[in-house]
Structure formats: structure tokens, C-alpha cells
């Protein structure tokens, strides 16, 4: 993230830690949109199926992905209105992304690859059989047959939107904590990854068990390192978040 100056509008004022925490909170609340859908279906029908009929399932997943994408975009615009750009084209010292030194890129790529490996290997080591993406596709194929590709495309739209919000939580939470913690070297601690890991890990613990919850925490911490070493830019953090959560 980079300070870009407060725009010349009547109600403009600089962002503070409380504002950044508010953005992170709104992003967390935005993740609950799927619960709103399930809750509505439960109220109307008295039950929530694992999978809806193909047409409705595709509409739900694609709709959620689009809503999440616009939520993340709205948070970016809101942040810029308060003088902070979460999508800078360069690093905090003014260099372009392409000019990041090889050590920073080596750390970014190493942590990103490590996150993917952890997402695949750690659940298996802790007793969770199978690979999540393969099992997901097998479930969709069993339910929808040859038309399962429609559901897969809708799920990918959902994944992109959801990961945009997850990366937003990480970025804004990191900046909020940095505004409060002033210890020497605090800027190198992956605060955003720890916060995101706590949030998504708690959800994973309730829905998928402790093995996936631990894997989620480790993966999010590594994504936090990616965010720090990548200049705190969502341009770098968001794609790697998508890559990691695609296999988690």
C-alpha cells in the first residue's frame, strides 16, 4: 500500500488504523454472503442441500463471485478516497514492481510455492485423504454428469471473487495492525496473514476439521509474507491468494 494524498473533496481525511480495521471488518462480513443465500434457502424450504440443481447452483456461485469482486473493488475505491492506494504499481520506495530485487522476488515465489505445497501435503499428512480440487470436481461430475463443466466455471468465478475479498482482509488488517504496533521490525511481521489465518482457520475448523484449519493458518501466514515482501500490493498478493486457495 502507498500513501497517495487525500483527494480534494469536502469530507476527505487521511486513513487511520481504525479506518483500515473497518475495511478489513467489512471484507470479513462480505464473506458471509454465501451464508445469506443458504439462510434464505433454509427459511423458504426448511433444508439446505449440499448442491442445488445445476442452473441454480451456477447462478449462486457466479453471483457470489461477482458480488465479492465488486465488494473488493469498492473497498479499494474507499481506501483511495482516504489517501491509501492498496494497488500501487510500485514498491514503497517508489520502484516499479519489476524492479523488486531478486531476493524479494525469491522470497515471494518461495512462500507462494510453499503455500501451495502446504495446502496439498499437510492435510494428507494429518489424515485427510484425497486432493481437494480433484474431490471437488469428482463431486460435481457425480452430481451433474457431462454438464458439470458449467458448475466448474461458476465455481471458478466464485473462487476469484472470494480470493479478492480474502486478499483484501489480509492487506487491510496488516495495515491496521502496523498503525498500532510500533515495535522495531514490526513491518516485516505478516500481521495480515495471521489475521486472515485466524478468520479462515476458525471457519475451516468448524466445517472441515482441525487438519484443514491448521493448513489454512500456515498457508495464510505464508501469504502474509508474500504481501510484506511484495511491497504490500494487492496486485501481487491477490493472484497468489487465488493460487493457494484453489488447492486448499
Describe every region a protein language model picked out.
Residues 16-86, 106-115:
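Alpha-helical transmembrane segments in multi-pass membrane proteins
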Residues 48-56, 137-141, 212-223:
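Non-cytosolic membrane-interface motifs at loop->transmembrane helix junctions
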Residues 28-39, 116-124, 196-206, 241-248:
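Aromatic-anchored segments of alpha-helical transmembrane domains
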Residues 1-24, 79-97:
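N-terminal juxtamembrane cytosolic/stromal segments of multi-pass membrane proteins
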Residues 12-16, 100-101, 140-148, 182-189:
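Helix-boundary and loop/linker segments of multi-pass membrane transporters
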Residues 113-135, 155-171, 175:
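Transmembrane alpha-helix/helix-exit interface in multi-pass inner-membrane proteins
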Residues 148-248:
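Transmembrane helix-loop-helix hairpins at the membrane interface
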Residues 51-57, 142-157:
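Short aromatic-rich membrane-water interface segments that cap or initiate transmembrane helices
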Amino acid at each position: 500500500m502507498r500513501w497517495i494524498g487525500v483527494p480534494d473533496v469536502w469530507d476527505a481525511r487521511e486513513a487511520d488504523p481504525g479506518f483500515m480495521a473497518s475495511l478489513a471488518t467489512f471484507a470479513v462480513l462480505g464473506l458471509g454472503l454465501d451464508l445469506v443465500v443458504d439462510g434464505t434457502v433454509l427459511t423458504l424450504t426448511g433444508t439446505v442441500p449440499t448442491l442445488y440443481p445445476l442452473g441454480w447452483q451456477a447462478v449462486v456461485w457466479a453471483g457470489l463471485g461477482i458480488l465479492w469482486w465488486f465488494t473488493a473493488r469498492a473497498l479499494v475505491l474507499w481506501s483511495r478516497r482516504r489517501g491509501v492506494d492498496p494497488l500501487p504499481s510500485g514498491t514503497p520506495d517508489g520502484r516499479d514492481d519489476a524492479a523488486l530485487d531478486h531476493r524479494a522476488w525469491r522470497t515471494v515465489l518461495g512462500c507462494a510455492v510453499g503455500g501451495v505445497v502446504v495446502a496439498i501435503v499437510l492435510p494428507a499428512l494429518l489424515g485427510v485423504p484425497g486432493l481437494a480440487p480433484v474431490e471437488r470436481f469428482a463431486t460435481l461430475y457425480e452430481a451433474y454428469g457431462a454438464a458439470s463443466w458449467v458448475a466448474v466455471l461458476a465455481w471458478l468465478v466464485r473462487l476469484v471473487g472470494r480470493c479478492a475479498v480474502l486478499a483484501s482482509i489480509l492487506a487491510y488488517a496488516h495495515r491496521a495492525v502496523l498503525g498500532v504496533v510500533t515495535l522495531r521490525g514490526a513491518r516485516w511481521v505478516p500481521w495480515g496473514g495471521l489475521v486472515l489465518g485466524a478468520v479462515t482457520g476458525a471457519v475451516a475448523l468448524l466445517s472441515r476439521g482441525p487438519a484443514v484449519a491448521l493448513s489454512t493458518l500456515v498457508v495464510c501466514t505464508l501469504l502474509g509474507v508474500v504481501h510484506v515482501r511484495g511491497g504490500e500490493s494487492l496486485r501481487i498478493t491477490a493472484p497468489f491468494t487465488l493460487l493457494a486457495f484453489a488447492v486448499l
